A protein has these predicted regions:
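Conserved beta-alpha-beta core of the PfkB/ribokinase-like small-molecule kinase fold
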Residues: 1-43, 51, 61
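Conserved phosphate-binding/catalytic region of the ribokinase-like
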Residues: 9, 38-144
Length: 144
């Protein structure tokens, strides 16, 4: 939830010690860490034992690291943007789906970005979320 007092870290710190994958939005990560650089955010949060840290940055794409490798993932081009509601949640769902399917860090972030690209092209938070097979075909057809 949004917190205007600026004590985000204090509110979630105990949970961070039990978090393996942490994928906040850029704005959330700034509020939590006080940092503006995504790499500095990751360094600060690593002390909690997080295995994978990523930042969703909307039209700037995303950043993801396992603290050994790091990737900046550009967003997929879309024909139109109808509504961005749910894009971040779709990104997280896509990332976790890819991890469960055994994909690596980079592939998971690309998969997540593709799911978010589908989401922004339709009205509503979940109306545009396709099956994993459709997402994989979409990725194969892209020039990246």
């Amino acid at each position: 939830t949004w917190n205007r007092q600026g004590d985000w870290l204090e509110r979630i710190e105990k949970a961070l010690y039990h978090t393996d994958i942490f994928l906040p939005s850029y704005q959330e990560a700034v509020q939590i860490t006080g940092e503006r650089d995504v790499q500095a955010m990751g360094k600060m949060l690593r002390r909690y034992g997080i295995s994978i840290f990523g930042v969703k940055m909307g039209e700037q794409g995303s950043y993801v690291t396992d603290f050994q490798k790091e990737y900046f993932i550009p967003p997929f081009a879309t024909e139109k943007v109808v509504n961005t509601v749910g894009a971040g949640d779709s990104y997280v769902a896509g990332f976790l789906t890819a991890q469960i399917k055994g994909m690596g860090l980079y592939e998971s972030a690309v998969f997540a970005s593709a799911v978010a690209a589908f989401t922004v092209q339709t009205m509503g938070a979940v109306g545009g979320v396709p099956s994993a097979d459709v997402v994989e075909e979409f990725i194969r057809k892209q020039k990246r």
